[in-house]
Structure formats: C-alpha cells, structure tokens
C-alpha cells in the first residue's frame, strides 16, 4: 500500500484468524472502538497542519482513527506470502470512503512474484535519536543519509529490483 491507512496483515495473523474475512473484521473491531472516528485528534485539526496546501485542507479526510488503527492492529505496508491460490491475502482499507463527504479513494498496490530470494548483504546502520523518551525518526530524511547508503549498496551490487528489509538489531533492548 502507498498509504498508511491501507495495508496487509502478516500471514501468521491471517492463519490465526483462519484466513476468514469475518474473523479479520472481528480482529479489527476493538481497534476501531479504541480509536473512534471524530475524537479530538490533532491530526484531524486540518487548519493546524502546515504541510497541507489550502486545496488539500479542503479535501483531506479526517482519518487519524484509521492511522491509529493501522498502527495498533499491526497492519503492514509490505508482506510476503508463499504463493497458494486457495489462500486469500486481505488488503485492508481503513478509510477508503471519506467519512466527512462520502468521497471514495482509489488505492494502488503492487504485487511482486518471485521464485528465488537470497541475501546479498547484511549491513548495520546507525540511526541517531533525540534525548526525548518517545521519538519518531524518518529514515528517508536526507540529513541521515540512510537511503543514500542503501542506494549506493544496491548500485555497487548491480541490483535493479529486489527487496530491502529494515529491522532493529537482534540485541536491541527496550524496543519493539
């Protein structure tokens, strides 16, 4: 998914839900209750959001509830499933219809089929964090240079298509 209010459940979660659409809905229901639409979320105070143009402020949905449900329920932007035509892969769209004006969103997703995967490199990169106890860092921030380093590694190895997996170090404590 190219948007953080639509995504996929990891295969292991789908297996625990018997790959059943009704079970997926039941799984998501408590998160929708925990993060109700229309609560006083700062994200939904569009007049305060400096990153939005005036046109975007007129059309942007109030969807903090969907973002929080996405995060809280463990939805993913990218998942890997073994190919099995009899088993569903659920795309879960949490705000495909703008709750304010009933406009429908269009979604785009990418499916990549492959029959081979091999690790080309395993690199540790440092991510600076602030002194605040709760922090969020954009790995795409050009000041960090992380994506520049990744692109350099891919270019050095001649990789034009593939998958980059980013995760915390195994010995990382007090995280995740």
Predicted regions and their residues:
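Active-site histidine-anchored catalytic micro-motif
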Residues: 1-176
């Amino acid at each position: 998914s190219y948007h953080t209010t639509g995504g996929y459940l990891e295969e292991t979660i789908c297996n625990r839900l018997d790959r059943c659409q009704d079970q997926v809905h039941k799984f998501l229901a408590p998160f929708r209750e925990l993060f109700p639409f229309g609560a006083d979320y700062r994200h939904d105070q569009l007049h305060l959001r400096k990153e939005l143009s005036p046109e975007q402020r007129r059309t942007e949905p109030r969807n903090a509830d969907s973002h929080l449900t996405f995060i809280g329920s463990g939805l993913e932007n990218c998942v890997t499933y073994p190919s099995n035509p009899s088993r569903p892969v659920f795309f879960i769209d949490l705000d495909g219809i703008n709750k304010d004006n009933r406009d429908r969103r269009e979604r785009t997703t990418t499916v990549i089929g492959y029959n081979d995967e091999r690790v080309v490199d395993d690199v540790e990169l440092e991510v600076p964090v602030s002194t605040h106890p709760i922090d969020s860092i954009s790995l795409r921030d050009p000041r960090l240079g992380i994506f520049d380093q990744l692109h350099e590694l891919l270019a050095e190895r001649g990789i034009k298509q593939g998958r980059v997996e980013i995760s915390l170090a195994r010995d990382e404590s007090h995280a995740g």
